[in-house]
């Protein structure tokens, strides 16, 4: 099972139907990847994601989505080992996904599809990053994007 929390930071909350769409996207992706755990999705404005992108990635501009995985140790962090017998007592916190709502609107218009489809795409994209997928090489990109499309097709978010 996947537990999802949706937060709004420095923006008006999106409506309940869109929030349910994000949950459906994440549940479909989790099912495809056979993973359980907890995910927090925070919806922000361009100024906030710009700040996070600059502070955490060293890129001084807004972006569409950022992912902060909890299951991969960062540089200089100590790895935590949990006894298998005790593992069920701890939730599998997969991480945080930060999405710029204004950027999603812009990109939906640029790509000629719905805002819902763009928001779903960014949600699944961020989720796959939490699981370690990347698109730094053509092979990685092909694998990641095919998984994204499979999830989006499954829930009816086609182009």
From Swiss-Prot:
Cofactor binding, note field: Binds 1 zinc ion.
GO cellular component: cytoplasm
Main subcellular location of this protein, as a coarse class: cytoplasm
Entry's localization field: Cytoplasm
A Pfam family hit: YbeY
Binding site for Zn(2+): 125, 129, 135
UniProt GO molecular function: metalloendopeptidase activity; RNA endonuclease activity; zinc ion binding
Keywords per UniProt: Cytoplasm, Endonuclease, Hydrolase, Metal-binding, Nuclease, Ribosome biogenesis, rRNA processing, Zinc
Enzyme Commission numbers on file: 3.1.-.-
Cofactor(s) annotated in UniProt: Zn(2+)
Primary enzyme class: hydrolase
GO biological process, one term: rRNA processing
PROSITE patterns tied to this protein: UPF0054 (PS01306)
Family: Belongs to the endoribonuclease YbeY family.
Biological function: Single strand-specific metallo-endoribonuclease involved in late-stage 70S ribosome quality control and in maturation of the 3' terminus of the 16S rRNA.
Name this polypeptide is given: Endoribonuclease YbeY
Organism: Brevibacillus brevis (strain 47 / JCM 6285 / NBRC 100599)
Name of the gene this protein is made from: ybeY
């Amino acid at each position: 099972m996947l537990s999802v929390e949706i937060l709004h930071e420095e923006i008006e909350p999106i409506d309940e139907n869109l929030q349910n769409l994000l949950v459906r996207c994440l549940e479909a992706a989790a099912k495809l990847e056979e993973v359980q755990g907890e995910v927090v999705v925070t919806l922000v404005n361009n100024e906030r994601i710009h700040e996070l992108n600059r502070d955490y990635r060293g890129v001084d501009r807004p972006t569409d989505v950022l992912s902060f995985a909890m299951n991969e140790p960062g540089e200089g962090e100590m790895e935590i080992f949990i006894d298998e017998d005790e593992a069920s007592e701890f939730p599998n916190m997969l991480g945080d996904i930060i999405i710029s709502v204004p950027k999603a609107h812009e990109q939906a218009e640029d790509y000629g599809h719905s805002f819902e489809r763009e928001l779903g795409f960014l949600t699944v994209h961020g989720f796959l990053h939490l699981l370690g997928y990347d698109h730094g090489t053509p092979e990685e990109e092909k694998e990641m994007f095919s998984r994204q499309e499979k999830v989006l097709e499954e829930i009816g978010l086609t182009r």
